[in-house]
Structures are given as C-alpha cells and as structure tokens.
Amino acid sequence: MADYYPLIARAIAGLDPNAPGESRRALYERARAALIAQLRSVQPPLSESEITRERLSLEEAVRKVEAEAAQRAREA
C-alpha cells in the first residue's frame, strides 16, 4: 500500500495559503480521480478490494492533511 500523505501534503503546501478550502477540495478530487484511473489501468487488473484499500489509504492521507490545516488555523 502506498503512502499518499507526503504527496498530498506537498501538493497542499504548493497552494496559496490564503486560498479557500475549495482549492484544497479540488486538489483532493483530482488526486482521487487520478488514483482510480491509474489503479484501473494496471495490468494484470487489481481486484476491487485492492482498489478500495488504496482509495482508503488516500482518504486517510487527506484526513491527516486536513486535521493539520485545522490545527494551524486554530493556532493562528
């Protein structure tokens, strides 16, 4: 299982700090779509459970990045 946290955290760090939450949500949606497309193109094909496991790993990385962003906002 891949560790998506560094990729997501780096992508978010590249956004304007004053950008609205919608910018982060759009980035997450692009990451989700790219991941699913990439996983579905793997040969031999991955099982649905393998795809779900990777998707959930990405979602955990998103939750972690969002929790860190919320913590920074509270401290500001």
Predicted segments, located by residue:
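A membrane-associated low-complexity tether/scaffold signal
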Residues: 2-17, 21, 28-37, 41-76
